[in-house]
A protein has these predicted regions:
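Charged DNA-binding/catalytic regions of mobile-element recombinases
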Residues: 1-286
């Protein structure tokens, strides 16, 4: 490691000075320079390139464990600690999570109980859906993004985007989910107590499709932790460091994140590091 440090910084500081400071001989350093790299070093170079490709391919959001599962899926045999070392050596860092935005405080019409009760797993598709919406700032003003996630596979089955924070926003997301998955049988829909979800329009849509309503307790975001996790990932992995000039630009980016990355590609620890679509495919329901 000392010789590697010297080789890396010899364009900045004199070799003789670094050898003296690190307690190694100059002859030993020069002998190390001309020595052919070991098999492990050559393997590190190959695996390191795959590590970087996985990290960049995830929009620089994957940490060591997800990169490791990416490489295992590609048939690369290596340990997690080796991946962690190669990530550190290349200075790769996953984007940190950011705090969310405040929730809606409009009038509530219908409040349902917390039927889900933090049971964020499902035995089959279309058994439990969770829903929420978030805000994205653009130079044209706010863009509101609503989403519906199937807890069986964490797949985003419905989404909607609008410049207005209305009942139509969340209604459109649920309509898409029903259109994609078919009319549900014994489905539980879980959301917060926002005025959009308690509206007569939204409640009528659920009643017409035989959907049971569940809502978080007031002020308790952990009652919808799976949904909070998705929006946290969206902000961390895609929109957090971007400035959108138009709502159309933001819409296109959110669409790309959901349909081209999150659903088909992004690995989830809760799914054994499979993507939602791969998880459904392995379960024989995709």
């Amino acid at each position: 490691m000392k010789f590697q440090f010297i080789a890396k910084h010899r364009g900045i500081w004199p070799v003789a000075w670094m050898c003296g400071a690190l307690g190694v001989s100059r002859s030993g350093f020069h002998a190390w320079l001309i020595r052919p790299p070991s098999q492990r070093a050559r393997d590190d170079e190959v695996i390191g390139a795959k590590v970087r490709a996985s990290h960049v391919g995830s929009y620089r959001t994957y940490g060591a464990r997800r990169v490791w599962h990416d490489l295992l899926a590609d048939g690369v045999s290596c340990g997690l600690h080796r991946i962690e070392r190669l990530i550190r050596a290349q200075g790769l860092r996953a984007r940190p999570r950011r705090r969310g935005l405040p929730k809606d405080h409009g009038d509530r019409s219908v409040i349902a109980g917390n039927v889900l009760d933090r049971q964020f797993t499902a035995d089959r598709p279309n058994q439990k859906w969770v829903a929420d919406f978030t805000y994205i700032w653009t130079a044209e003003g706010w863009l509101y993004v609503a989403a519906v996630i199937d807890l069986f596979s964490r797949r985003v089955v419905g989404w909607s985007m609008s410049p207005n924070m209305t009942a139509q926003l969340v209604t459109d997301a649920l309509i898409m989910a029903i259109w994609r998955r078919g009319k549900p049988d014994a489905l539980l829909h879980h959301s917060d107590q926002g005025s959009q979800y308690t509206s007569e329009q939204f409640q009528r849509l659920m009643a017409d499709n035989g959907v049971t309503c569940s809502m978080i307790r007031s002020g308790n975001v952990w009652d919808n932790a799976a949904m909070e996790s998705f929006f946290s990932s969206l902000k961390t992995e895609r929109i957090g460091k971007k400035i959108y000039r138009t709502r159309a630009q933001a819409k296109a980016d959110v669409f790309d994140y959901i349909e081209c990355f999150y659903n088909p590609t992004r690995r989830h620890s809760t799914l054994g590091y499979l993507s939602p679509i791969d998880f459904e495919r392995e379960a024989g329901v995709a």
